[in-house]
Structure formats: C-alpha cells, structure tokens
Amino acid sequence: MDKKIFKEELEKYKKDIREFANVIHTSVNQFYDKDKPYIYHLDKVCGVLEDYGYEVCETLEDVKVLVFGAYFHDSIEDARITYNDVLKIAGKLGFSNLESIHAAEIVYALTNEKGRTRGDRENDKYFNEMRLVKYAPFMKCCDRLANFRYAVETKSSMEKKYRQEMPEFLKRIGITEPQDLMNELSSL
C-alpha cells in the first residue's frame, strides 16, 4: 500500500481507538515501566506500525484493524477484559462484524499463555496460534521493537534479554516481511 495513503488512513482511526485503549488501561492503574501511563507504550507500538505497516497492509479496511491491534494488543492480558469485550469495543468504534472479529483475533493471538516464566508464557502454542492470524506476527514484531527501543533508550536490563532472545524470536515468529522491519529486528 502507498505509504502516504496508509498514514492518512491510520490518522483517521487513531484518535478514537487510542482514547478507548487509554481508558481501558488507565481503569486498571496500569503503567509502563512503573512511572509512565500505559498509553506511552501503546503509542510507541503504533509508531512502529506507522513506520512499517504500509508494507504489509493489503486493504484500506485493514488499516483500522492494525491500529486497533497496536492499541489493544495487551488489553486481554493486562486490562482485565475478555475476547468478547474486545469484540464489543471494536463494534462501538464502528468496525463491521468481520473487522471486529479480525481485530479481536489479533489481540487474542498476542495474549500470552499462562505460565510462571517468560518462556512458559511465550511457548510453542503461543507462536503457532499467532502465525494463524493475519497480521498478528507483524503486530508482535511492532510490540517487540517498541519494547526493545525503550530498553535501549532507558538502558534497561531488558535490552540484553531482548538481544539474547531475538534470533529465536525471529525464527518462531515465522515472517520475513516487511523486510525493513525484519532487518531492524535482526540487527539487534
């Protein structure tokens, strides 16, 4: 998709989706890195989407699904809402039934499994099921890159962890496009 058209479409949907996600995460007192409102992280994920989404987005209708995925990808896991809540929120935001289902499937696919450790939560089942949902692996890459950039910026111990995990993460995520995003992740 043309980059300019993608960004114009993204801007059409971003404000309302962002506001709804902010309310959801704020309602459970969720923060990013202890002191930042959680919307800080979600904006960073949407920023990666803005950089690379045009390379994978197939239709104009898919743009709002991707924006929704960027802003709601952690909502089931962290904001105490269910898959059905996600469907309803997408509907309230004007999504068609099919768009609502696709948006909810992305969010669900990015919801970690139950587990005591990071490895338990991001297990084979998690990646296998994620790869079945259109755009879910791409959205996970946006999330991972946003987290990594923040770890570098703040000199967090997670920087080392993300670097160590990256080769296995890229193998398990199972995508090679968009090439620029994959190159950035591979270079970490």
Tell where the protein language model's regions lie, with residue ranges.
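Active-site helical microenvironments for divalent-metal-assisted chemistry
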Residues: 1-188
